[in-house]
Amino acid sequence: MSCPYAGNGNEHDDSAVPLTTEVGKIYGEYLMLDKLLDAQCMLSEEDKRPVHDEHLFIITHQAYELWFKQIIFEFDSIRDMLDAEVIDETKTLEIVKRLHRVVLILKLLVDQVPILETMTPLDFMDFRKYLAPASGFQSLQFRLIENKLGVLTEQRVRYNQKYSDVFSDEEARNSIRNSEKDPSLLELVQRWLERTPGLEESGFNFWAKFQESVDRFLAAQVQSAMEEPVEKAKNYRLMDIEKRREVYRSIFDPAVHDALVRRGDRRFSHRALQGAIMITFYRDEPRFSQPHQLLTLLMDIDSLITKWRYNHVIMVQRMIGSQQLGTGGSSGYQYLRSTLSDRYKVFLDLFNLSTFLIPREAIPPLDETIRKKLINKSV
């Protein structure tokens, strides 16, 4: 019996016969691989001094830019869905799915850095002279990602000029300007949080109930501290309770909160912060499950961008040290290190929510009125 997988000269080879009569494109045409795979122009090769690792350098950065394009595509679709007065649960599920996709892409980008680190500093030096004045600072797509996410111009670290001035192309500058004007993910999430059901003073009034719970919690802490037999320990506990009281005052007093926003220490409006805290407390409720996932994914995105920046900083220090200027004229390592601060963390308030937690048993219970309202599928 002949092997069904083995061909012979007498059999008709139908491997090239189309499986469909529909008009379409073959794999290479559809992906435009002729353009994609012909876009690696090694300047060292043009100079008749080819450096092997320049090819890796180009491929890695092109891969970054392709993934940046996909992140922008996802962010734009998410922003479109959030830019509505009412968002039903099916939309929330889709937003969560796409944010999760961005998280996985960013994890991949973080993991790409070690591949570039297989190149030694001497290997990099062999072709670094060809890179000037090019610089990662000139990545238009990364700047668009930052702006669409919600990095504010006034929060940026300046190195020797405004970040948008590195782009000589007017079309690129227009893209930057438009991304600064358009509602960012931060702004749209803030609007969405401000509509959290249960914040209404005429309804459940979560914020008033939360303040009452905090007051009772701190009063119980004071009573417990007063029973401490050791004077020094008692004073220490009372001092710690007063510090916590001041922390809570920073969210309960709108004037204090607004001052922190002006200073750049907070990002959300006062009401949006209330919504985020409420979702965090009641995340086990079916209605708040997806919103809580959404907030968690936003923190994941912030964290992964920070990790990517950190890995980039370490790689730059390893390749060129901490004193040399970058190829684009920036302060290189020093500038990149400065971007690791909280000023570049867009959803900083979400990271700090744990500061305001109270024990589970102290969380105000939901009444029947709010439970019925939470059955409504839209916010």
From Swiss-Prot:
It comes from the Eukaryota. It is an enzyme of class 1 (oxidoreductase). Pathway: Amino-acid degradation; L-tryptophan degradation via kynurenine pathway; L-kynurenine from L-tryptophan: step 1/2; Pigment biosynthesis; ommochrome biosynthesis. InterPro entries: Trp/Indoleamine_2_3_dOase-like, Trp_2_3_dOase. Binds 1 heme group per subunit. GO terms for molecular function: heme binding; metal ion binding; tryptophan 2,3-dioxygenase activity. SUPFAM superfamilies: Indolic compounds 2,3-dioxygenase-like. Its EC number is 1.13.11.11. Pfam families: Trp_dioxygenase. It catalyses: L-tryptophan + O2 = N-formyl-L-kynurenine. Its cofactor is heme. One of its GO terms (biological process) is L-tryptophan catabolic process to acetyl-CoA. Heme binds at H312. Transmembrane segments: none annotated. Coiled coil: none annotated. Substrate binds at F57, I58, I59, T60, H61, R128, T327. Keywords: Dioxygenase, Heme, Iron, Metal-binding, Oxidoreductase, Tryptophan catabolism. Belongs to the tryptophan 2,3-dioxygenase family. HAMAP family: T23O (MF_01972). Heme-dependent dioxygenase that catalyzes the oxidative cleavage of the L-tryptophan (L-Trp) pyrrole ring and converts L-tryptophan to N-formyl-L-kynurenine. Catalyzes the oxidative cleavage of the indole moiety. Homotetramer. Dimer of dimers. This is Tryptophan 2,3-dioxygenase. It comes from Drosophila yakuba. The lineage of its organism: Eukaryota, Metazoa, Ecdysozoa, Arthropoda, Hexapoda.
